[in-house]
C-alpha cells in the first residue's frame, strides 16, 4: 500500500523553464508590456460576434488589457483570424473609425525606463491592407498605429501611417515635442503601397540600437528603413494611449487597413532582445493563423 501525504504548500524546481501563454513571451525578462491577438482564445473572447465599443482584447502577457474604441458600426466583424474593418471592401474610405486602444500605463512604462532620448521599445503589428487599386493619391496621413494624440497638437508618442500623395509611402514619426519629431519614411525597396497591396503584413517600429527604425514583411517582400539617431524628447507622452486601427488622431481617407490581427509592445530596456530576431521567429510561428 502506498502512502499519500497532503501538504498545504507547493514545491517547484526553479530551474525548470517557465511555460508562457505565447512563445513571443519566452525569454522576454518580463519586458513585453502588451500582446494581443484576435486569433487567440485567451486574448479575444468575443468569438465571431460583432466588435463593439468597450469590448476587451485581453493582454496575453497579463499586464495591460486593451479595449475597442471609436467604433461606428460600419460593418466591422471578426474574420480570418482578425478584426475586419471592411467586409464590403469599401468602408475604410467612408471615414469609419475603430481602434484597439492600450491603456496609458503602457506609454508611462516606456517613458519611465530611460532619459529624454533613451526610451527603447519595439511595437509590432500584423495587419492586412486592401488592394492598392483602392488607394487614392491625396496628401492626407492615414494613421494605423500610433498615439491617440496627434503629434502636431499635443504630447504624443509615436505614429505609423500611410503617407499618401502619389508615392504611397510608409511614414513613421517619433514625437519629440509639439510639431517636432524624428521621421523615418519609406523611400527605398519599392513603394509601401505596392508592396503591401492585398497582403498580410508584419510591421515593426523600434528604437533598438538608439535609432528610430522600422521593418515591414510580407510573404514575398521584406523592407527595412530608418536608422536616424534619436533626438531628445522635450515633452511627457506618458499619458498618451497607443492605438492600432483606424484612429482619429490622423484619420484622413483612404483608410487602407482591412484587417488587424496581432499587436505587441515591448520595453527593450527591460528585455534586452533584438526586436527583428524576435519578429522573425514570431512570424514563422503565427503567420498561418491569418487570412
Show where each model-derived region lies.
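Solvent-exposed strand-to-loop "edge" motifs in beta-rich extracellular domains
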Residues: 39-41, 125-135, 150, 206-208
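Extracytoplasmic low-complexity segments
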Residues: 1-98, 276-291
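Flexible glycan-contacting loops in extracellular carbohydrate-active proteins
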Residues: 225-261
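A carbohydrate-recognition surface predominantly in extracellular/luminal proteins
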Residues: 33, 81-82, 86, 101-145, ...
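Glycan-recognition/cleft segments
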Residues: 142-178
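Short, aromatic/His-centered strand-loop micro-motif at the edge of beta-sheets
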Residues: 171-202
Amino acid at each position: 500500500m502506498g502512502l499519500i501525504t497532503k501538504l498545504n504548500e507547493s514545491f517547484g524546481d526553479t530551474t525548470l523553464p517557465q511555460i508562457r501563454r505565447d512563445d513571443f513571451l519566452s525569454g522576454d525578462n518580463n519586458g513585453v508590456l502588451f500582446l494581443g491577438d484576435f486569433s487567440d482564445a485567451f486574448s479575444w473572447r468575443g468569438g465571431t460576434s460583432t466588435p463593439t465599443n468597450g469590448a476587451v482584447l485581453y493582454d496575453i502577457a497579463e499586464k495591460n488589457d486593451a479595449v475597442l474604441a471609436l467604433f461606428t458600426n460600419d460593418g466591422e466583424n471578426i474574420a480570418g483570424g482578425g478584426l475586419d474593418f471592411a467586409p464590403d471592401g469599401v468602408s475604410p474610405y467612408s471615414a469609419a473609425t475603430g481602434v484597439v486602444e492600450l491603456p496609458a500605463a503602457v506609454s508611462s512604462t516606456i517613458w519611465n525606463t530611460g532619459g529624454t532620448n533613451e526610451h527603447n521599445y519595439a511595437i509590432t503589428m500584423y495587419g492586412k491592407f486592401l488592394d492598392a487599386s483602392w488607394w487614392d493619391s491625396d496628401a492626407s496621413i492615414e494613421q494605423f498605429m500610433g498615439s491617440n494624440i496627434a503629434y502636431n497638437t499635443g504630447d504624443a508618442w509615436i505614429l505609423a501611417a500611410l503617407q499618401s500623395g502619389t508615392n504611397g509611402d510608409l511614414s513613421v514619426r517619433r514625437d519629440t515635442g509639439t510639431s517636432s519629431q524624428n521621421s523615418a519614411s519609406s523611400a527605398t525597396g519599392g513603394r509601401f503601397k505596392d508592396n503591401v497591396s492585398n497582403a498580410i503584413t508584419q510591421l515593426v517600429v523600434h528604437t533598438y540600437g538608439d535609432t528610430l527604425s522600422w521593418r515591414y514583411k510580407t510573404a514575398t517582400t521584406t523592407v527595412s528603413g530608418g536608422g536616424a539617431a534619436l533626438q531628445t524628447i522635450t515633452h511627457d507622452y506618458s499619458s498618451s494611449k497607443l492605438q492600432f486601427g483606424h484612429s482619429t488622431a490622423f484619420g484622413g481617407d483612404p483608410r487602407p487597413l482591412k484587417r488587424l490581427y496581432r499587436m505587441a509592445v515591448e520595453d527593450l530596456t527591460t528585455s534586452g532582445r533584438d526586436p527583428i530576431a524576435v519578429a522573425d521567429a514570431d512570424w514563422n510561428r503565427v503567420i498561418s493563423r491569418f487570412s
